């Protein structure tokens, strides 16, 4: 049985070889996400601020950077895996705009580590549900998939913090996008806050009251989208919201 399964896997690899998410080079293993060169150029965030998720160089015990310590966030903690740039940025753009849902499922492996940190008991009480940041229905029809959902599906199954049976559920319908925001591209923080204001709504407040959530998205650019989602959940009675991104854009 094992031999047959290995043979099928080998045949599939020959017919449809795994390719690097960054440069599209054929990989030697289906388990890899990047080739060696792209993996080296994909930079982990490391020690980061709990508010903006940007790298900071203070002691690890210091959660907040000087710029965020006096700010009021709607979420309690932010986590990100990598700096947005280089091969990872190429992979994310290709995933979102090149009709590559399978790329989202592969990149989801890289989201498992920060999601595990967000779910860890040392961070706070247990999370009730993981929420992917939703797309507007029009954009979902155009793209064919929600990259945040695809990332979350994979990352949830591989998050190292908790055994599979005790993982929070993934709720894909609780948070809705009710305003079709334009592509924000290089928009600054204030423009992004204005663009996403009123863009999200809760489908059923009864499923929110007193609950704790983790929001998941592909890129955290300024934090405006995460903060707006967290505010909407907070107004509906959420006890806590943490946020997790695959990549964090550097200022």
Q: What is the meaning of each model-derived region?
A:
Residues 1-251:
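Glycine-rich phosphate/pyrophosphate-handling loop used in enzymes and phosphotransfer proteins
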């Amino acid at each position: 049985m094992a031999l047959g399964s290995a043979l099928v896997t080998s045949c599939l690899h020959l017919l449809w070889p795994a390719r690097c998410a960054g440069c599209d080079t054929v990989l030697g293993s289906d388990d890899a996400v990047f080739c060696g060169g792209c993996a080296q150029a994909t930079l982990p965030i490391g020690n980061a601020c709990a508010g903006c998720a940007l790298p900071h160089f203070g002691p690890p015990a210091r959660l907040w950077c000087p710029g965020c310590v006096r700010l009021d966030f709607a979420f309690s903690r932010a986590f990100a895996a990598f700096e947005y740039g280089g091969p990872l940025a190429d992979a994310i753009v290709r995933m979102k705009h090149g009709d590559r849902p399978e790329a989202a499922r592969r990149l989801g492996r890289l989201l498992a580590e920060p999601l595990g940190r967000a779910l860890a008991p040392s961070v706070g009480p247990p999370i009730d549900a993981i929420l992917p940041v939703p797309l507007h229905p029009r954009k979902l029809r155009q793209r064919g998939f929600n990259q945040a959902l695809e990332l979350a599906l994979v990352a949830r199954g591989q998050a190292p913090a908790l055994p599979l049976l005790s993982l929070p559920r993934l709720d894909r319908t609780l948070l809705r996008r009710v305003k079709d925001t334009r592509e924000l591209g290089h928009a600054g923080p204030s423009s992004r806050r204005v663009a996403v204001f009123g863009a999200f709504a809760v489908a059923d407040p009864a499923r929110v009251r007193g609950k704790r959530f983790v929001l998941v998205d592909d890129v955290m650019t300024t934090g405006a989208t995460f903060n707006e989602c967290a505010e909407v959940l907070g107004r509906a009675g959420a006890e806590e919201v943490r946020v997790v991104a695959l990549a964090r854009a550097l200022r």
